[in-house]
Each structure stands twice: as structure tokens, then as C-alpha cells.
Amino acid sequence: THAHIVALSQHPAALGTVAVTYQDIIRALPEATHEDIVGVGKQWSGARALEALLTEAGELRGPPLQLDTGQLLKIAKRGGVTAVKAVHAWRNALTGAPLNLTPAQVVAIASHDGGNQALETVQRLLPVLCQDHGLTPAQVVAIASHDGGKQALETVQRLLPVLCQDHGLTPDQVVAIA
């Protein structure tokens, strides 16, 4: 519609991508609305996020994640191109042992500014935080599922022992603060 064109006109790269690949986007994401596509395109590097969805959506819809259109759009809109590519690249590592994350957990982590960094940090720190510090995978995911998830996870790893032993906080309280 005219309103969608106006919204995308502030993002020339996305407008060009949508103009050239709109039918391909609809084929790759058949449940996506015009508003969904414009919502991704309006983001910083939205054109690249749409292009990443075009190339990665097919495999992300299949095992092990089996993401639906809404989940794919959420990652692209909130986490951007780097999150879409990270989820694609690490889908087997994230869902396999020892992490065993669910698709919903992967989407929750990836759907934020810095989602790709949070996913990378979860791969590195989830086993450590669970085995060495007694956190549950759900607690680690909760910490990672916000803007700045990487930094929050690294801070919890560094300060959890001090906060619990020296200051009497429980792990649940530290997770709530993080």
C-alpha cells in the first residue's frame, strides 16, 4: 500500500529489496503480512534481515528448530540479520547436547538487540553456569533473553559467587536482578 511504501522510503535499501524480492518473501513466509515485512524492513539493516530470511527460512522451518513465520519475523525484526544468521549457523549446537535448548528458548534469546552475541555466550556459559553455579537452563535463558544478554551472562558468571557467599543473595535473587 501507499503507507507501506512511505514507511519503507526512509530505508532505501529495504525499499529496493522489497520491490525486487516481494514475491519471493511471500513464498518463503506465506503467513507474513505487509505490516510484518515492512516492520522488518524498517529496522536498521532491515534489507539484509529480509535477505537473510529469504536464504535461511527454509532450513529454519525444518528440524531441529521448525520455526514458524511469526518466530522467524520476530528474530529478524528484533535481532536483525546477525541473529537470523546466528540461529541458522548454530541451530544444531543450540538444540543438541549439552545445551538442549527448545525452539522457543532460541527465539527468546535471538529476538533482542545483540541476540547473536547472546546466543554465542549461551553456548559458552550455559554449561558453566549450570554445573559450576547451580543455575537451571531456564534461568540462563531468562538472563540472556534481553538486550545486553551477553554482558548480563558474563557479569552473572563473574559475580554470582561473591553475591551469594559474601552478600547473602540467593541465585534466584541474582537472576532476578540480572
Give short role names for the model-derived ranges.
Residues 1-178:
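Non-catalytic all-alpha helical scaffold/repeat segments
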